[in-house]
Amino acid sequence: MAQLMPDVSKYRPDVKFWMVFAAIGLFAVLLARPQFGSKLETVKRQGVEVMIALDISNSMLAQDVQPSRLQKAKRLVAQLVDKMENDKVGMIVFAGDAFTQLPITSDYISAKMFLESIDPSLISKQGTAIGAAINLASRSFTPQEGVGRAIIVITDGENHEGGAVEAAKAAAEKGIQVNVLGVGMPEGAPIPAEGTNDYRRDRDGNVIVTRLNEQMLSLIHI
């Protein structure tokens, strides 16, 4: 499926996201194994299971993507859920740790409620544990046979922990499609300091600038 997916640096986040969704939809149709012959038959798209791994580290508060990286990501996920049919969705949130925000479900109303409640305060430990998120997502699918499975990682890729590439390869070996959506700009942006009109600063008083780590994300894209 990698050849169907856009490079993480080529397109705006919303364009990339819908290319990801279209590719997953095509994968589901291929799983249905349509037979071609003299009789025209309608092939119903087989449902897929999609685990969203969403970065909620403080850098996702940067506003180089409006209204912020995190809010943009949440809006795109909500739009994806609205388009689902016969599919299941679950959500992993991660920063320095990763945990399940929503077990995989076909209850789209609940999915959007859980999505709305996501914010950086859910995880106090900072970092970008992409590998842990992918590993957790890989274990979160149902045991049902004959269904497509995909993980969509949404992150800026900054300050990532080790093991992300290895986790993506391990998931791919299980037949799980691993897709990465980079949110942010390579030029970077400061991180708003919550409750103030200022930005987060380092120990020397310098404004912290967070940048999209395109190079690392391209390695995870399996």
Residue ranges of model-derived segments:
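Juxtamembrane linker/hinge segments adjacent to transmembrane helices in membrane proteins
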Residues: 1-24
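Short, glycine-rich, amphipathic interfacial segments at transmembrane boundaries or analogous
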Residues: 2, 47-49, 191-196
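Membrane-embedded segments
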Residues: 33-148
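Soluble catalytic domains of enzymes that build or remodel membrane lipids, polysaccharides, and related
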Residues: 97-216
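Conserved small/polar residues in nucleotide/adenosyl-binding loops
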Residues: 220-222
